[in-house]
Design a protein with these regions (language model features):
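Feature captures outer-membrane beta-barrel proteins of Gram-negative bacteria and organelles
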Residues: 9-20, 40-54, 188-202, 208-212, ...
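Short, acidic Ser/Thr/Gly-rich low-complexity loop/linker segments typical of extracellular
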Residues: 501-509, 586-597
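Short, ordered, surface-exposed loop/turn motifs in non-cytosolic proteins
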Residues: 490-500, 571-585
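Outer-membrane beta-barrel channel domains
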Residues: 4-168, 224-228, 236-292, 427-522, ...
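Extracellular beta-sheet/turn segments enriched in Thr/Pro/Gly and aliphatic residues
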Residues: 160-166, 476, 539-559, 624-643
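Conserved structural position at the C-terminal beta-strand
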Residues: 144, 611-613
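Transmembrane beta-strand segments of Gram-negative outer membrane beta-barrel proteins
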Residues: 1-11, 17-26, 164-184, 204-206, ...
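Compositionally biased low-complexity segments at domain edges in trafficked proteins
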Residues: 167-196, 555-582, 637-643
Length: 643
């Protein structure tokens, strides 16, 4: 029996500085593996600003080119391009969901162009990752590392949809820089990238582009057609000449189709790349040639199909197919099927199937899974809770059964999960897993425990943000995109509505993340959570941030007691309806209602009220007050008389 203790650590750092219109951003990942070796990988650093008159962005530093026409290329240099965030929300492109099946608590890493762009931990069973910050046009390489060290790898194609934009619309991308390789042995060199897309009318879109360096050239031309209900089709041809490899030249033809059939709620995405000659190469192919050697497989055809079918109340079907043929290698194919629905309105049922086949290595993976989830939190009065059963047909033809209990608590701040898995063949793979995460105003804490016959794992982590601003330092949850700095004039412990765990700190600040750029965002404070000694004129603030901006959401608050006062004049007659009441040396005011009653907030324990019901001195008075009679809901009730 072999026993060992191993530790691994992971930290993702994403510092940023906003100075006027400029956004300075950096991303890096530090890892220390089980072997004790540590590594820091700098993903990118750049400065960027919006140019509103051009609906564009100017970027200086490290990033990747656009990918509507050519494959995305990592670079270090300068880029001026149309900003997608300035395009109406419904016309934006979204990243495909990465789906897979983990056999245990596993680490999932997603790479693009060799760089890790996303890393997370998933529980055993099917997973779906939809918030990956990928660059369109480059495949995503997914690595799933199980708790026993076994690794499964697969690729998720990320093909740009059919190119078709509205009449008169213009999109462009101009980049000058140096190729930024992941591998140190790759070729290095300056290059330029230029693409332009123009909508001639509602039917026809034209586009062209060039990628060039001292030893490489590629040119493309194509047209996109918008057939409305019949969908959008784009057809283009690309020519390349590789001076790094004896001036080999080649060409490729690409057809892309995208359509949404609104009558049937069916979405089609089809892309086919036909490489007319073996010598065609992308810019990355030419620059990475030294890394390929004997495994330099040349693609002949690459076809991907995705169909999403909504059945309204009867569920959602998602089908993906991909087949790649090579000039000098046998075929590869990948298929994924997923269907989910609700039974009896609240019981969730999901069935999935993933298949990968590489005929060259005779390597085949075939995984089937099914699960059913039953909510019962209301039965035991414990927030939301679900009991879930899942069965998986593993790659080794064994059957894994698992039962899990998961749910949310503390106003959706706490997420928890307990899972027990049993394998039909290998009882050493039976596992018990526990995991939880807790959202706070300063971030999200998570913890996990995983035990099997051979392995015991436990770990924890925290992610969040630290914001330095003109009034101090504020901790918050992880910032994604634009964010708002909540400012409540020093009022603490105020909850932001529909943002679990976001509460103002001792200085009255909080961070709200995930705001939409270039559109109105309404941020509400939760009225029921405001303390009895705090008053807020308006519990809503509306902001329209630019991309990656940090905007201030200001709320006018007053500290002090609240009271319903009955005011009498010198003759013990109730003060007239509509009279104005103010507090000496404070901004608190009120209007007298029926029977001389007025609601006031922001009051000290004692003070002087000024009451005015006319212009002359006989139509106003002062009333000293002391708050003594506190009623329910934190309200005081007093009867006061003019002096």
């Amino acid at each position: 029996y072999y026993s060992s203790n191993n530790e691994s650590y992971y930290a993702s750092l994403n510092p940023g500085v906003n100075i006027g219109s400029w956004r300075l951003r950096n991303s890096g990942i530090w890892m220390k593996g089980y072997d004790g070796e540590s590594e820091y990988q700098n993903s990118y650093i750049y400065a960027e600003r919006d140019i509103r008159s051009l609906k564009s962005k100017l970027l200086l530093g490290e990033s990747s080119t656009g990918s509507e026409i050519f494959d995305s290329v990592p670079f270090k240099g300068v880029r001026l391009s149309t900003s997608d965030n300035m395009i109406p929300y419904l016309e934006r492109t979204f990243v495909p969901t990465v789906r897979g099946v983990a056999n245990s608590v596993a680490q999932v890493d997603v790479r693009q162009n060799g760089y890790i762009i996303y890393s997370t931990e998933v529980p055993a069973g099917p997973f779906a990752l939809s918030d990956i910050p990928a660059a369109e046009g480059s495949d995503m390489e997914v690595t799933v590392t199980e708790d026993n060290g076994s690794v499964q790898r697969f690729t998720v194609p990320y093909n740009a949809p059919a190119i078709s934009i509205k009449s008169g619309s213009l999109k462009y991308d101009v980049t000058f820089g140096k190729y930024r390789p992941y591998y140190n042995v790759s070729r290095k060199g300056n290059f330029s990238h230029f693409t332009i897309i123009y909508g001639f009318n509602d039917l026809l879109t034209g586009y062209t582009g060039v990628q060039a360096s001292n030893n490489y050239f590629s040119g493309a031309i194509g047209f996109g057609f918008n057939f409305n209900e019949l969908g959008a089709v784009s057809l283009d041809g690309i020519y390349s000449k590789d001076g790094y490899n004896n001036d080999e030249d080649g060409s490729a033809v690409r057809v892309r189709y995208k359509n949404l059939l609104s009558e049937t709620n069916t979405t089609f995405d089809i892309a086919s790349y036909q490489y007319a000659s073996k010598n065609y190469s992308t810019f990355a192919d030419a620059m990475e040639k030294s890394m390929r050697h004997s495994y330099d497989w040349k693609k002949k055809n690459d076809t991907s199909i995705r169909i999403r079918q909504s059945f309204s109340d009867y569920g959602l079907l998602d089908l993906s197919l991909n087949k790649t043929t090579y000039w000098n290698k046998k075929d590869e194919s990948y298929a994924a099927f997923n269907y989910s629905t609700l039974l009896l309105r609240n019981i969730s049922f999901t069935v999935g199937w993933n298949k990968y086949f590489d005929s060259y290595y005779s390597d085949q993976e075939d995984v089937f899974s099914a699960s059913i989830s039953v909510p019962f939190g209301k039965m035991i009065n414990s927030g939301s809770a679900n009991l879930r059963y899942q069965i998986i047909n593993e790659r080794d033809d064994s059957i894994s059964n698992s039962v899990s209990l998961n749910g949310m608590a503390y106003n959706n701040r706490l997420a928890w999960n307990v899972t027990q898995s049993v394998n039909s063949k290998e009882h050493n793979n039976n596992r018990t897993s526990l995991s939880s995460s807790l959202k706070n105003s300063f971030g999200t804490m998570n913890a996990m425990y995983n035990h099997s016959h051979m392995v015991t794992q436990y770990g924890g982590g925290i992610n969040g943000s630290i914001v330095l601003h003109d009034k101090g330092i504020t901790f918050g949850q992880r910032i994604t995109g634009a964010a708002a700095l909540i400012d409540t004039d020093g009022s603490e412990n105020i909850t932001v509505l529909n943002k679990p765990g976001v509460i103002t700190d001792s200085n009255g600040f909080a961070i709200v993340t995930g705001l939409g750029s270039y559109r109105k965002n309404d941020i509400y404070l939760e009225q029921s959570k405001i303390s009895s000694d705090t008053s807020i004129d308006k519990t809503i603030s509306s902001v329209v941030p630019t991309d990656s901006a940090l905007v201030r959401a200001k709320y006018s608050t007053m500290k002090g007691s609240k009271a319903i006062l009955k005011l009498l004049d010198r003759n013990n007659v109730p003060i007239a309806f509509g009279s104005v009441v103010s507090v000496q040396d404070k901004s608190s005011t009120g209007i007298v209602g029926d029977d001389g009653r007025v609601y006031m907030s922001g009051l000290d324990g004692s003070g002087i009220l000024k009451v005015q019901w006319g212009k002359n001195s006989q139509e106003q008075c002062q009333i000293p007050y002391t708050l003594k009679n506190k009623k329910s809901l934190g309200l005081y009730s007093e009867t006061l008389k003019c002096m």
